[in-house]
């Protein structure tokens, strides 16, 4: 059996159409008042308020519940419809509805809508004539019932009374909106000017930082150039010292084996890396001192064998 949910879909469509109508009414009102707005913000705010009212008041659940009951009846399930009929015919339900009506009346009265205005609104409705400035006043069923019950009288001694109605002072409303707009404009300008000042300060700090970085980079480049020059000078000096020592070594009256040994130690000096060169010089000096020490010990032993003594003056 085909399951029908057309009533639920129609109720959901009516609720969605009501929301869209609320959005259109809100945006058109803002446009007529000359107020600039963000459509997405208006849409979000109206949707939030609409959903809250529909859910909190129970209107949405009530409509959807009745639609589900109708669909169930159309599908041959009359249990829910019978329960609703019994509920509507119950005296407690009638008392609850009367209580709700009385609450609504008191709420309208507290909002300044008195009994006279409520009765007139319930007895008459106004139909606008397309293309004309005039309107047609229509009597409702309540007015017809009052005529049949003789509850309508004609006052021949009618004295025009000023009806108390809520009027809107559009000039005052415009002045208020203009003040709010000017206040908002002033706050926006203040925030914009503050942002501009902060942006300028950030830009100045950035430029200053870039200048400092450029100066530091230039100083680093100078130090690098000085370091390279110093390294080249040290390499040149080390090479010159090694050459000078080799020349001096060749002029000495030493044996060829000693000269070859010292030259090998000099050739092992790293002339490209000054740090390694200093370590190599230290090693050469240690070896020379060690050789001198052994030579002195041998000389001292030879003197002792010859019955000579060695003194330092």
UniProtKB/Swiss-Prot annotation:
Biological process according to GO: regulation of translation
Region (RNA-binding): 1-149
One Pfam match: Rota_NSP3
Keyword Oxidoreductase found: no
Self-association and partners: Homodimer. Interacts (via the coiled-coil region) with host ZC3H7B (via LD motif). Interacts with host EIF4G1.
Region ranges (Dimerization): 150-206
Residue segments, region Interaction with host ZC3H7B: 170-234
Entry's transmembrane regions: none
Keywords (A to Z) from UniProt: Coiled coil, Host cytoplasm, Host-virus interaction, RNA-binding, Translation regulation
Its biological purpose: Plays an important role in stimulating the translation of viral mRNAs. These mRNAs are capped but not polyadenylated, instead terminating in a conserved sequence 'GACC' at the 3' that is recognized by NSP3, which competes with host PABPC1 for EIF4G1 binding. The interaction between NSP3 and host EIF4G1 stabilizes the EIF4E-EIF4G1 interaction, thereby facilitating the initiation of capped mRNA translation.
SUPFAM superfamilies documented for this protein: NSP3 homodimer (SSF69903), Rotavirus nonstructural proteins (SSF58030)
Coiled coil stretches, renumbered: 166-237
Organism: Rotavirus A (strain RVA/Human/Japan/AU-1/1982/G3P3[9]) (RV-A)
Name listed for the protein in its UniProt record: Non-structural protein 3
Region (Interaction with host EIF4G1) residue spans: 208-313
HAMAP family, alphabetized: ROTA_A_NSP3, ROTA_NSP3
Source taxon at top rank: Viruses
Similarity section: Belongs to the rotavirus NSP3 family.
CDD domains in the record: NSP3_rotavirus (cd20714)
Cystine pairs: none
InterPro entries recorded: NSP3_N_rotavirus, NSP3_sf, Rotavirus_NSP3
GO cellular component, one term: host cell cytoplasm
A GO molecular-function annotation: RNA binding
Localization per record: Host cytoplasm
